[in-house]
Amino acid sequence: MAHPVQSEFPSAQEPGSAAFLDLPEMEILLTKAENKDDKTLNLSKTLSGPLDLEQNSQGLPFKAISEGHLEAPLPRSPSRASSRRASSIATTSYAQDQEAPRDYLILAVVACFCPVWPLNLIPLIISIMSRSSMQQGNVDGARRLGRLARLLSITLIIMGIVIIMVAVTVNFTVQKK
């Protein structure tokens, strides 16, 4: 089935299309980038040469360039970089970001030996969920689940100790009578 020959680029009069090369910011971004010392960095010939525009499924042009063609990355604005660093320093320390969050699996297993039987399986399950979240790359979720497993394990261990103390106390007071 033959298609009529279409131009490679849509005309500027068509609705929804934009003349990408008419924008001065686009030309500046495609041809040069400045580093901190105001020295011009040369990009590869694929960026400074003619644009390779292709049609996507909606009929709009897009540029097809892989990341390997860049010789130097475009610099980020200093205000964004400094605000990112400041917010990350204010919220968490560098050492906390580098270490993996604990899942408290051993503490959850110890809690399983306490006499609060159906409830002491919950920290074990949450601890395993924390470990799997860490393996999937969800560090915040793993940290949150690890803390919850620790809290529940400690709570159930204390409840188990209280139950044992009550049982021993009742046992010795009943034998004396």
Swiss-Prot record:
Q: Which residues lie on this side of the membrane: Cytoplasmic?
A: 1-105, 127-153
What topology does it adopt in the membrane?
Single-pass membrane protein
> Where do the record's region annotations for Disordered lie?
71-92
Is Transit peptide tagged as a keyword?
no
Q: Name one Pfam family in it.
A: CD225
Phosphoserine carried by residues:
S48, S87, S88
* Keyword Nucleus in annotation: no
Q: Which family does it belong to?
A: Belongs to the CD225/Dispanin family.
Q: What is this protein called?
A: Trafficking regulator of GLUT4 1
- Which gene carries the instructions for this protein? TRARG1
